Amino acid sequence: MLSSARGRIVFWEGASMWVLSAAPNVGKEGIKGTPHSHHAVQVTFALDGWYRLESGDQSVGTAIAAVAPDARHAITANGTVAFVYIEPESVAGRAVLRRLFAKRRLVSVDTALFGSLPADLLAAYRDPAVTEGRLVEIGRALASRLSGEVEIPTEDERVAKVIAWAGAHLATSIRLADAAAVAGLSPDRLRHVFVRHTGLPFRTYVLWLRLLKAVEAFSRGESLTTAAHQAGFADSAHLSRTFRRTFGVAAAELRIS
């Protein structure tokens, strides 16, 4: 990720989008990030300016590029760059893996796939009146264009009940067996139904709920420790480890200007 940057970050279940701009005092050489890896698929968009991604002996500087899960890489960038992160265990994430990473861990992505969405995102990012909901809408659309049509059935009342229950109990231990009891299903049956209707395994979905909760609390000004406890992490170190594994940065780096 990039230091010396300002920007906006939005999260939704199974994905997130980070739009970052180089600080005004950054020169033509841009900001150089440190080499790192993370478990989420990363798709990088040059909204204005430029970037270059490096992974091993590969180097990509196209308008849009993607990095496979757990691939060590570094970025140098200037201008405004967007990162869309997708959970690789999700239905959409698995579709992206099949589509992009059959031969290489760092790939260019055809800009025609996204139409006007990158320009829409840049305009929305520059408009201080644009809501978080609008940014999430654009982020979801970008992820959807990348994964292609992923069939998710209409909402199941039992799954909706489990999601509401899990969201209300994030500060406690959440077990599949307890969730199954809420749904009135066996654990094995809930596991199958949950993936079918959300695109994410139950355990992964709960982890993203916890990350969303922690980010929300931290953005309100809570300490990292308080945010971690409210979201059901053991402590701030546990939250930071989880965050770094998923996105390649510590949770404390969310406090960008």
Predicted regions and their residues:
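Conserved active-site tyrosine of GNAT-family acetyltransferases
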Residues: 67, 233, 239, 243
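Generic protein-terminus/edge-of-domain signal
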Residues: 1-52
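Terminal helix-turn-helix DNA-binding modules in bacterial transcription factors
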Residues: 173, 177, 196-234, 256-257
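Short hydrophobic/aromatic patch on the recognition helix
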Residues: 190, 194, 238-239, 243
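Short, Lys/Arg-enriched, Trp-marked, Pro/Gly-tolerant hinge/linker segments that flank
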Residues: 104-115, 122-186, 196-204, 208
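A hydrophobic/aromatic-rich effector-binding and dimerization subdomain
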Residues: 50, 64-143
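Short coil turns linking two alpha-helices in DNA-binding domains
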Residues: 186, 234-235
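Short, charged, intrinsically disordered terminal tails
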Residues: 95-97, 148-149, 245, 253-257
